Amino acid sequence: MAIDFHKTQIESTYKDKDVEEFIDIYFFRPIGYMLALSARSIELTPNTVTILGMITGVISGHLFYYSSITINMIGIFLKIFSNALDSADGQLARMTHSESHMGRILDGISSHVIFLSIYIHLCLRYIHEGHSKWIFAVAILAGASHYIQAAWGDYYRNGYLYFVKGPKFCEIGSLDQLLYQYQMLKWKGRFINKFIVYIELKYILSLQMFTKSYRILTTMIEKIYREKIPSWLSQEYRRSIKPMNKYYNMLTINVRQFTLFALLLLKKPELFFIFELVVLNIVFIYAATLQENKIKHLVSIAKSRTDNKPNGEKNRDKR
């Protein structure tokens, strides 16, 4: 099978270059593209690739239980391969135009299951080495922080796609839309569909206190422009929010996983929980505050623009 690694073809499978990390562009995306092409050639679905990535990641977590550097290195390799599969599932979905809410939910579940495996095995390793079982309490706090940080980063990264590329590129539905879908769907006969909407609702509701101004802005857009983002707002959002992408990415996968790898090689993996609780929470608090202030400014600009226009112009100012 001939595999084409032309740069433009790989870039066609990005969500958007603005939200891609350096290591993703030059490492995970090219490998993911190769895996996606291979998966397509043997007719694997994106969800199958996601499940394979989850299994690989869970096994890597188990290998972090052992004190042997050699075994830990194998675990690190498997975790990197799991990340490549995580990249490949989305690239395959975009390549085959088979993106779905089910795929997105499964992708999120996969990430949480992998880190659950890592957390549990790190705790068991710490206890096996003769230390306190209180490490589980620390791990639970770190896990809760991890969930909020990663959910926040993922939510606003999708928000960036919503405003800069358009609503159809955003993988997260609005709260009102999801509530309506949840009320309309019946558990009987539509269990899976309703469960997917339920998971996404819980995800959005868990971020309510961190996304107040953003919800005001999106509600205004839905009401006035019917989700047709005006070009001036798209440009202003990109100019103001593009620098925030580094914080979104810092709070999701790569930074925490490479920190974990370094601590494993230093034989101090328990410090990973401290990194989660202290360093990443400081980054999160700073980024969340900065994001809220930037969005408030965009809300004030949007209100000023819409208040000063006749109704007819409001509907014409669309992309």
Residues of each region from the PLM?
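C-terminal membrane-associated helical module and adjoining short loops/tails
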Residues: 1-30, 158-319
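Structural signal for membrane-spanning alpha-helices in multi-pass inner-membrane proteins
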Residues: 61-65, 118, 122-123, 264, ...
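Long, highly hydrophobic alpha-helical transmembrane signal-anchor segments
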Residues: 106-181
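Juxtamembrane helix-capping/reentrant segments at transmembrane boundaries
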Residues: 93, 97-110, 169-172, 308, ...
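Membrane-embedded alpha-helical segments that form the functional core of polytopic membrane enzymes
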Residues: 46-102, 115, 119, 135-145, ...
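Transmembrane alpha-helical segments that form the membrane-embedded catalytic/substrate-channel core
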Residues: 81-87, 144-160, 282-293
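Select subsegments of transmembrane alpha-helices in polytopic membrane proteins
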Residues: 46-51, 107-115, 245-254
